[in-house]
Amino acid sequence: MRKTKIIGTIGPASEDPAVFREMCLQGLNVARLNFSHGTHPEHQKKIDMIKAVREELGIPIAIMLDTKGPEYRIGTFQNGKIELKDGDAFTFTTRELQGDETTVSVSYKGLMEDLAIGDRILVNNGLVIFEVESLDETDACCRVLTGGVLSDRKSMSFPGKVLNQPFLSDHDREDLLFGIRNGVDFIAASFVSRKQDILDMKEFLHENGGDGIDVIAKIENQSGVDNIEEICSVCEGIMVARGDLGVEVPFTELPAIQKYLITKCRLLGKRVITATEMLESMIEKPRPTRAEISDVANAVYDGTSAVMLSGESAAGKNPVDAVRVMGEIAEETERHIDYVERFRRESYVIRNRVDAISHAACTMAIDLDASAIVVTSLSGLTVRMVSRFRPPVPILGLATNRDSWRKLALSWGVLPVLTEQFPSMEVLNYYAVRAARDVMDLQPGSTIVMTGGDTSGESGNTNVLRIETVP
């Protein structure tokens, strides 16, 4: 069983039900919808398709809504584009005007209040770089450090800066309401810089009936990296969004930052997704490059919860093969990881009862050479905490509602199983043992470790740790 989960972005190449169905059969766990592109009717069509296919297959494919996030763009040019050379003078302005070879307007009207002399401005994914030389109320006069072509409405970024634009735009609010109405499982919050960004989003979700949605913080700038612990304290996971992050920080630092974020989140018990250009060449070609294979494998070695396909599955020629190849790389890599040695070497912080029981369950599974850990959890918290310790055996997550069942699709090493609410511990134990036997085809005499809450139906009531033998 593959432990690392796979997220696939759904787009023109994968929105056909037959193609999406094959992606699911090849091991897709989460369907991502990128709300930086497309209209609500277009996304509605995709969501309806995803729900129909997962219902047909009877598998927990979760839906992730990826927000556009705070956006900073230049305006338009008289001729559509210009070319700048190193050393040229150029001005960004909040005044409304058509751009030319010397000046262009910007979308964020509070920009001049947030900038300082010496700041760098990156445009078009960092391809053209400017340094601020002087400022007034409306204009930032800059020197071109790295020249290139600028065209209409290209994105802007500001390395090392936290701008004061509200985190939730009107566009994002409308998208969140759309997601709530459609029962999405995850929100991927773009450009998270601090804890308050997540709190603002969660407050909006709470006010509009979206309490059950898990929020994944996309780390795309240095502030997000610096504030990772406080961000993790209020979100349900993070995404190492290497595209924009690689623009905001020196690209040579990206591998070390990725390893740091994965390790930090794993030890904190948060799901972590590694994303962007993982199998980029498969947009056009049927096979990945050797470097891409190593990239996916290294994320798996680091302990990422999931790896993500973007353009490969949304617009590529081989979306089904991309899922298959990613799964094969992950599964083969996992065969070479000594999870027992890693578990014994790691220094975990045990913060509460759920942590303690989850850690004990993993220890018992290793010491008894158990075939599986079976976890009953109303909210999925205990399952995620067992997953945090990356045990060497499969984790069966028994969920009593479909929302929790689908959200377990993103947890490392977890095989989600949908069950009913049981009237007593005896009935629960009976069902759990047989579920493990049937789902995993266990032999009589196999040992399983059981943990989770009792049958009271109260979330967070983890108090059970048992050893059972398969009859």
Can you annotate each of these PLM segments?
Residues 1-471:
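Non-catalytic helical/linker scaffolds that mediate oligomerization, partner binding
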